[in-house]
């Protein structure tokens, strides 16, 4: 008589069977359990492109891929130059449009799913560092695409396992995004772990780099201290200004952000408070004219 399967083996068997059948039914979250947070400074053996131009977006958004792949040239070594050889990376299919919205730390994908029909002409990407959680969102999106094939829904959203604290500029060009969502990030309560918070002076500069002027960073948390931290760091950054409360509450995406994430629903169930703040990317200052000319 065989031994009963442990929980990990049951999870692996479930996910393997789901994918073998083509992922036509929505995945069950209990088979994708993982720790609530991951250390962003650990070596997660992540795969990332050297430059945004070398990112294979077509595998994430196949319905927006152009027909002909584009061959990517790579740097040649001295020996290859002497023999006249030129290496080429595998051909990459480009997209008909760029990703413009990023959900950093997308969790189980609640916000992605809610944004898909609201922003039907916009490509939205969820970024998540945890392996099992990323797999859940992948399977969830695949199932929703199959179930809504006639309506052509959920083709504009995707998820990518990535560490945005290290590699965000590897995926996005300067000024590519017009919206960034940071929803219920890990608060890292201990002072010695504040350097792991997803909002900091350094990271805000990276957000400013990938966000076009006029673009918005959306933040929400149920931790007052973290809310004050994020507000303080964005207010102190010269590339951002806080959006007024009136404009914030008039933005329909704020209500979606409040109510559609899994963490937001949990806060609602426990009658907790949700602290929201939006920040607009300012225009870069002009270079001073050369008075010596």
UniProtKB/Swiss-Prot annotation:
Keywords per UniProt: Methyltransferase, Nucleus, RNA-binding, S-adenosyl-L-methionine, Transferase, tRNA processing, tRNA-binding
Binding site for S-adenosyl-L-methionine: 105, 128-129, 163-164, 183, 261-263
Gene Ontology annotations of biological process type: RNA (guanine-N7)-methylation; tRNA methylation
Gene Ontology molecular function, alphabetical: tRNA (guanine(46)-N7)-methyltransferase activity; tRNA binding
Gene3D superfamilies hit by this protein: Vaccinia Virus protein VP39 (3.40.50.150)
Residues annotated as catalytic: 186
Keyword S-adenosyl-L-methionine: yes
Gene Ontology CC, one term: tRNA methyltransferase complex
PROSITE patterns: SAM_MT_TRMB
Catalytic activity: guanosine(46) in tRNA + S-adenosyl-L-methionine = N(7)-methylguanosine(46) in tRNA + S-adenosyl-L-homocysteine
PANTHER family given in the database record: 3-DEOXY-D-MANNO-OCTULOSONIC-ACID TRANSFERASE/TRNA GUANINE-N 7 - -METHYLTRANSFERASE (PTHR23417), TRNA (GUANINE-N(7)-)-METHYLTRANSFERASE (PTHR23417:SF16)
Family membership noted in the UniProt record: Belongs to the class I-like SAM-binding methyltransferase superfamily. TrmB family.
Main function: Catalyzes the formation of N(7)-methylguanine at position 46 (m7G46) in tRNA.
Subunit field text: Forms a complex with trm82.
Identification of the protein by name: tRNA (guanine-N(7)-)-methyltransferase
Organism of provenance: Neurospora crassa (strain ATCC 24698 / 74-OR23-1A / CBS 708.71 / DSM 1257 / FGSC 987)
């Amino acid at each position: 008589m065989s031994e009963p399967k442990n929980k990990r083996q049951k999870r692996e068997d479930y996910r393997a069977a789901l994918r073998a059948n083509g992922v036509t039914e929505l995945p069950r979250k209990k088979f994708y359990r993982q720790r609530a947070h991951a250390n962003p400074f650990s070596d997660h053996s992540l795969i990332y492109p050297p430059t945004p131009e070398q990112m294979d977006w077509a595998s994430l958004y196949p319905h927006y891929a152009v027909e002909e792949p584009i061959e990517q040239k790579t740097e040649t070594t001295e020996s290859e130059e002497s023999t006249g050889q030129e290496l080429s990376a595998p051909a990459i299919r480009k997209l008909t449009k760029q990703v413009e919205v990023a959900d950093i730390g997308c969790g189980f994908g609640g916000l992605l799913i809610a944004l898909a029909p609201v922003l039907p002409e916009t490509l939205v990407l969820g970024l998540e560092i945890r392996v099992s959680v990323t797999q859940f969102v992948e399977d969830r999106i695949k199932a929703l695409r199959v179930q809504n094939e006639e309506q052509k829904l959920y083709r504009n959203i995707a998820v990518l396992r990535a560490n945005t604290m290290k590699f965000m500029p590897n995926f996005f060009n300067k000024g590519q995004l017009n919206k960034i969502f940071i929803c219920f990030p890990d608060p890292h309560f201990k002072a010695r772990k504040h350097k792991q918070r997803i909002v900091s002076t350094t990271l805000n500069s990276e957000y400013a780099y990938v966000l076009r002027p006029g673009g918005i960073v959306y933040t929400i948390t149920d931790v007052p201290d973290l809310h004050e931290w994020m507000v303080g760091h964005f207010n102190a950054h010269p590339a951002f200004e806080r959006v007024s409360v009136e404009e914030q509450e008039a933005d329909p995406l704020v209500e979606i952000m409040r109510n559609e994430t899994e963490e937001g629903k949990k806060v609602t169930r426990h009658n907790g408070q949700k602290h929201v703040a939006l920040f607009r990317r300012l225009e870069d200052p002009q270079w001073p004219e050369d008075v010596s000319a």
